[in-house]
A protein has these predicted regions:
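Short, aromatic-enriched amphipathic alpha-helices that serve as compact interaction elements
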Residues: 1-18, 26
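A solvent-exposed, acidic/Ser-Thr-rich amphipathic alpha-helical stretch
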Residues: 5, 20-74
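A short, polar/proline- and glycine-enriched secondary-structure boundary/capping micro-motif
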Residues: 45, 88-90, 119-123
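Short, cysteine-centered beta-strand-loop-beta hairpins and adjacent loop/turn segments enriched
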Residues: 60, 83-93
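Short beta-strand edge/turn micro-motifs at domain boundaries
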Residues: 95-121
Length: 123
């Protein structure tokens, strides 16, 4: 189970925009990630590639400071607020909860929950 400092370090890295690096540092080799209502995808290498593809689709992705989390045993829930800017200059804000199960110091399962009405049409 992670300590509060370990989860805080993840939050700090994501708030600095180091998304790909955070997966390498904090996710287990066999980790799975599941978007809102989608099937899970797995393996740290695939998660890194998925993150790179998401970042390549946008001009920028910013995590707003002030993310909060709850930690209970090996479960952490983090409230994230992101601003995605498309390559045409338009942007949208998205709030989500990330429910994580940790094994020791690494995330083994993560599932995202958000209101899809936040997403622009066609996303």
């Amino acid at each position: 189970m992670p300590g509060r400092e370990r989860v805080q370090a993840l939050v700090a890295m994501v708030e600095q925009g180091k998304y790909v690096e955070a997966i390498g540092e904090f996710y287990a080799e066999d980790a799975t990630m599941q978007e809102n209502g989608m099937p899970p995808r797995g393996g740290r290498d695939e998660l890194v590639e998925g993150e790179r593809r998401m970042l390549a689709r946008h001009a920028s992705v910013c995590t707003l400071p002030g993310s909060t989390f709850v930690l209970e045993g090996d479960i952490a829930v983090i409230r994230w607020t992101f601003v995605f800017t498309h390559k045409d200059g338009t942007s949208f804000r998205m709030e989500e909860l990330a429910h994580q199960r940790w094994r020791g110091e690494r995330i083994v399962e993560e599932r995202f929950f958000y209101d899809p009405a936040q997403l622009p049409r066609g996303s």
